[in-house]
Amino acid sequence: MSTSNIVDALIIGGGPAGLSAALAFARQNQSAIVFDSGRYRNAATDYMHLIPGLDHKAPAEFRATARSQITDRYDKIRILEGVDIVAAKKTDADSFELSDEAGQTWNGRKLILATGVEDVMLDIPGYAELWGKSIVHCLYCKGYEQRGGSAGVLAVGPLGNVNMALHIARQETALSKRVTLYSNGNESLAGELVSAFGSATAMRTDARKIKEFVAGADGKGVAIRFEDGSEVVEDYLAHQAPVKAREGLADLLGLEKGPNGEVKVSSPFQQASVRGVFAAGDNGAMLKNVPNAVFSGHVAGQMASTQLLADLNGQKSIFPI
């Protein structure tokens, strides 16, 4: 392989984690290619939060600004939009080769997976349509704008247990006057929740079986329609959908995974189980939000850059990577 055809880093994912990793390489005058499929977990939401200076900005605006800042200022970073990487492997030369859907290949000395995850929608009519709007997965990201009224917790799936359901319900009590935990027909869980309420007076349960979700009046809030024909309206409903990896690249590379399917990384260095592969953002973290994606993306970029510079100089890195 000619060294003229290889870049320092291949970064799969053009969200906050991938862009942050690219910026780390840019600041060390190293070359990188970012492959942006155009699929983003927060595409359904109108605004993102928790980033000082960018609070309540549209996710698309954040990405566009980051892309332009990187490519306008740093000439060794390329961002390829609309490119899906379908294959990845480590070569005999201890570098990495990627292939896209059209069969084009790229080679890089280090590889950063920032592919994110995909939320698996519940099989309840209306759930997918309201996801990211009035059905929210993170109360630090959304919920403040709907504060002051009533809210619900959908206590099914990942939230279908006392510990997780109450964890989310407690967050809602800081935002809403009344919190109802909906167990969707699970009478046993509803009873366990009541027993665990303690001194909480703002919480209650509803075990009725849910038929569908529809948008509230003027598109605000969520109406929960039950199989018995009744209906209630909440300002918003919190739920954490199950997630899955967007691409099977981790399996192709033989990477170890954590209990929830995320790429297993060495903390705090973000290196995966194969040397030279780093993971950042939602696909390698328990806390899946924009601030953590930005942080872990920078760490992955810095550590991959640091490891590469040690390799090129025939030395060991100061870090155990």
From Swiss-Prot:
Cofactor(s) it depends on: FAD
Entry's Gene Ontology BP terms: cellular response to toxic substance
Binding site for FAD: 14-17, 36-41, 49, 114, 282, 289-290
Keywords: Disulfide bond, FAD, Flavoprotein, NADP, Oxidoreductase, Redox-active center
Keyword Flavoprotein: yes
EC number of the protein: 1.8.1.-
UniProt-listed Pfam families: Pyr_redox_2
Subunit architecture: Homodimer.
Family: Belongs to the class-II pyridine nucleotide-disulfide oxidoreductase family.
Protein name: Thioredoxin reductase tcpT
